[in-house]
Amino acid sequence: MKIFSILLVALIICSISICTEAFGLIDVKCFASSECWIACKKVTGSVQGKCQNNQCRCY
């Protein structure tokens, strides 16, 4: 049972790291979140994005 718990925790940690690296900052300069929507649609297939530190972040 201990091994199962350890494997489960390891799987969760790996899944979190993979998911957080899947999307993120893209090389598009912006001043408003609406400028990121089209760029994020092209990269991720979703318009969910925002302008963060003058760079688009897609979700």
From Swiss-Prot:
Subcellular location: Secreted
Pfam families: Toxin_2 (PF00451)
Marked site: Aromatic residue of the functional dyad: 59
Disulfide cysteine pairs (residue numbers): 30-51, 36-56, 40-58
InterPro entries: Scorpion_toxin-like_sf (IPR036574), Scorpion_toxinS_K_inh (IPR001947)
Site (Basic residue of the functional dyad): 50
UniProt keywords, alphabetically: Calcium-activated potassium channel impairing toxin, Disulfide bond, Ion channel impairing toxin, Neurotoxin, Potassium channel impairing toxin, Secreted, Signal, Toxin
Keyword Secreted: yes
A GO CC term assigned to this protein in UniProt: extracellular region
Segment forming the signal sequence: 1-22
Tissues where the protein occurs: Expressed by the venom gland.
Molecular functions (GO terms): ion channel inhibitor activity; potassium channel regulator activity; toxin activity
Superkingdom of the source species: Eukaryota
Function: Blocks calcium-activated potassium channels.
Family the UniProt entry places it in: Belongs to the short scorpion toxin superfamily. Potassium channel inhibitor family. Alpha-KTx 16 subfamily.
Domain free text: Has the structural arrangement of an alpha-helix connected to antiparallel beta-sheets by disulfide bonds (CS-alpha/beta).
Protein name from the UniProt record: Potassium channel toxin alpha-KTx 16.3
Origin species: Olivierus martensii (Manchurian scorpion)
